[in-house]
């Protein structure tokens, strides 16, 4: 029995630490995503010259709100599922789901980053002037929401690495072709 414990790919001492880090990161994602949603949805500014600007006027912000909602919901479900005995052994499920969430967070963050770039710099080639001088408070709140979204993304990137470690540590390391040839020869 002791030989089995010694040859296990993941030592039992790492599991509680890894599980604690995993759960902590998932729990951190929830308030970060909720704060991102709240900052974005309540963001609006009225300008006497150009009119009212709301988050719903910009598709990239709506996309970020949707992805933030999905990430908060997924993080909550994943925290609960990580303590359910029958789902704990589903390392592939967490691996694939964490990868998907990380990619979705990257795409939504990139969409908002593009909006902010155009809002701050404009695009003279297509006659778009910068807008943040007229809507400074709106741009500042979007910046803050994007920063919170980026922190949630960092949590998912670490979670993706942890779940990849869990999945791939279940398998033996690859054998080099020389070792295979030597084994066949003997």
Swiss-Prot record:
GO terms for cellular component: plasma membrane. The chain crosses the membrane at residues 21-41, 64-84, 100-120, 144-164. It is found in: Cell membrane. Residues 1-20, 85-99, 165-186 are cytoplasmic. Keywords: Cell membrane, Glycoprotein, Membrane, Transmembrane, Transmembrane helix. It comes from the Eukaryota. It holds the Pfam family CASP_dom. It is a multi-pass membrane protein. Disulfide bonds: none annotated. Residues 42-63, 121-143 are extracellular. Glycans are attached at residue 57. InterPro entries: CASP/CASPL (IPR006459), CASP_dom (IPR006702). Coiled coil: none annotated. Belongs to the Casparian strip membrane proteins (CASP) family. Homodimer and heterodimers. This is CASP-like protein 2D1. It comes from Vitis vinifera.
């Amino acid at each position: 029995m002791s030989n089995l414990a010694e040859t296990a790919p993941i030592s039992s001492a790492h599991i509680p630490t890894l599980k604690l880090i995993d759960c902590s990161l998932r729990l951190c994602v929830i308030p970060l995503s909720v704060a991102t949603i709240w900052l974005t949805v309540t963001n609006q500014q009225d300008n006497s010259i150009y009119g009212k600007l709301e988050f719903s006027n910009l598709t990239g912000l709506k996309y970020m709100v949707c992805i933030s909602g999905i990430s908060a919901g997924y993080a909550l479900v994943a925290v609960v599922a990580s303590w359910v005995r029958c789902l704990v052994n589903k390392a592939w499920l967490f691996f694939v789901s964490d990868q998907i969430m990380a990619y979705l967070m990257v795409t939504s963050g990139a969409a908002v980053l593009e909006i902010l770039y155009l809002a701050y710099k404009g695009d003279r080639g297509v006659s778009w002037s910068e807008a943040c001088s007229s809507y400074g408070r709106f741009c500042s709140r979007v910046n803050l929401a994007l920063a919170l979204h980026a922190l949630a993304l960092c949590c998912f990137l670490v979670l993706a690495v942890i779940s990849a470690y869990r999945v791939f540590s279940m398998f033996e390391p690859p054998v080099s072709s020389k070792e295979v040839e030597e084994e066949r020869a003997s």
